[in-house]
């Protein structure tokens, strides 16, 4: 067996440990055993007429865990970073391709905010009603005071579809990028800033 075949076999085995049901669902699941924050996402998507494909899986805390999800949904899951300035007075949600490296200096220069850092779990829960590992653009539906500024890497905007969690990291969604931009964001009263990140 070649080295490439071994790597593929190991990745498939890891995927099976995290994804027991490979069915892609397109309807709202029963609420039993699911958090209200997750069900609220499905309710809003239905209200806005936004279709999606849903994949249930074990908790996935990192973008590396999501490789199997990428393959099954035919998308690239977004890397979502919750950031703040040094004074912890301005907050950002950054959506970028999972394979890109995040360089603080590169982003800081573009948005005019020096010394960016990762915001705390407490702010994440307060503003987005999300816990670490489940950060998602869907969390903006909970940011009624517009405390969080959305930043989207231009490569994410170029894709027809994007992948995100519905505020929990046990489910992944495939959504049309245009639906998120033209339907979801206006409804939750959030704009966005396009950024150019090279990861270099």
Where are these regions (language model features)?
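Extended, low-hydrophobicity, polar/charged segments
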Residues: 6-200
């Amino acid at each position: 067996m070649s080295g490439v075949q071994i790597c593929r076999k190991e990745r498939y085995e890891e995927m099976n440990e995290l994804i027991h049901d490979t069915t892609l669902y397109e309807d709202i699941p029963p609420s039993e055993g699911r958090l209200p924050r997750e069900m609220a996402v499905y309710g809003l998507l239905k209200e806005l007429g936004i279709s999606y494909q849903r994949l249930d899986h074990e908790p996935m805390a990192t973008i590396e865990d999501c490789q199997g999800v990428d393959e099954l949904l035919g998308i690239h899951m977004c890397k979502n970073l919750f950031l703040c300035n040094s004074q912890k007075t301005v907050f950002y949600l950054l959506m970028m391709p999972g394979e890109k490296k995040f360089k603080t200096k590169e982003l800081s220069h573009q948005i005019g905010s020096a010394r960016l850092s990762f915001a705390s779990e407490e702010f994440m829960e307060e503003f987005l009603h999300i816990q670490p590992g489940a950060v998602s653009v869907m969390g903006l539906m909970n940011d009624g005071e517009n405390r969080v500024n959305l930043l989207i890497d231009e490569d994410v905007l170029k894709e027809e579809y994007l992948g995100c969690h519905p505020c929990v990291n046990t489910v992944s969604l495939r959504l049309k990028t245009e639906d998120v931009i033209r339907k979801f964001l206006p409804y939750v009263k959030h704009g966005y800033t396009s950024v150019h990140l090279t990861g270099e």
